[in-house]
Amino acid sequence: MSSESAIVASLKGQLSKFSGMISKGFKKPKKKLIKEMLYGIQASKDVKLSNIGRTLKENQPLIKTEDRLSRNLDDEDFTDSINEEICRLGASKITEDMVIAIDPGDLRKKYAKKMEFLGRVRDGSEREIGDGYPLCKAVATDIESKKVIPLYCEAYSFLAEGVKSENSQLLKMIDLIFEHTGDWGIHAIDRGGDRGVLYKKYLGEEKPKRFVIRLVDRDLRHQGRRRNCCDLAKALPTPYETVLIVYEEGEEKKRTVYYNAVPVKLPSYSHKLYLGVVKGFGIEPMMLLTSCLVERNRKESIWRMVEYYLARWKCDESYRYIKQCYNLEDVRVRSYISIRNIGVLVLAVSYFASVYLGQSIKLKMLVERIFIVSKRFFGVPSFFNYAIADGIFNLLYPDKTALRGIKQNSIEDFQLCFDFG
């Protein structure tokens, strides 16, 4: 057996084991579907059922395989179950001060006309309103490293039964994350998090949950007076400074930013909060509201709070990876259940590639070999997860046996893996 054949066999075995872990509550036909979809999405780097079907190498016409996949994706919604399992697995990797980025996103469908419950969404990348489905996403990351941990991804529609609002979907996701992570992790949210219902969730108990939220326009209480956050930010002196390396149009540039923090409260709550102000990113100051403890006389403590928010930008790269690497916005199924299922399956694929394969020394060696395959074909990419996806694609796509020959995992196969660093 050649070295690449051994890598492929090992990769298939790990994929089969991972599939069994996240589908343990389903019946046998659904377990088979989930394993085939996880394999096919990675082997084709695509979510179109025709391309997934080709990678399965079945001894029947492709249209038969495609029809079977379509039928099985449509008859049961397993979004909540797989999100639960991925969140459970990911929570064990989260440390006390990791950042958990909460993001209401979108799955844009520019040219779709007949997809079920197709609604209107705001396209964040193109800054326009168009057809598509809203997304709820959560990813965890560490400030000191490039490691990202996908936790949650759900596509939904306001036209579907049982969906009340974006707020209800966000709260559903946040509740699940709290259920598995407890008080560990700091929730970081962009401007979309500046809403009363989220402050109620984070500050509704005696001990506040830790968060960093970018403000838009809100009144705060400072020194007993009610003041607008924009006015307060403009008037606040920013004596501390740091130099950041930013990338604009492919070029590395230095940017000096100035920052400070001041204690504040929200008008309806008694909890002590801090308003962090950063000047230099744009014309207007960046305003961050946090419940994390900030030592105002230590610039490192203030900047740490800013770093919690800036780490969210690494999570944005992970979102782009999930969308672009597997062509999620090119999904071509009509039923609402199928769209939701494919969305959560792409989350599972990204977790497998970016987290599961690196959780033990033996698997880390497999990742290194996959990375070498990726470099040989593509060069070194800027984001490690792209390299792993490319490497897996190059190993699985030309394979002629697909999932045939992989033994069915039993419960004894799911041994505990301890990460010793």
Question: What name fits each language-model region?
Answer:
Residues K35, L49-S50, E66-D67:
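Short amphipathic alpha-helical segments
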Residues T55, N72, Q324-C325:
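Short acidic/histidine-centered micro-motifs embedded in hydrophobic/aromatic stretches
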Residues S44-R54:
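Short, charged amphipathic recognition helices of the HTH superfamily
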Residues L38, E66-S145, P263:
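Active-site-proximal, Lys/Arg-enriched surface segment
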Residues M1-Y39, A43-D46, E85, M98, ...:
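Single, function-defining residue in the core of a domain
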Residues T55-R68:
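Short, basic interhelical loop/turn and adjoining N-cap
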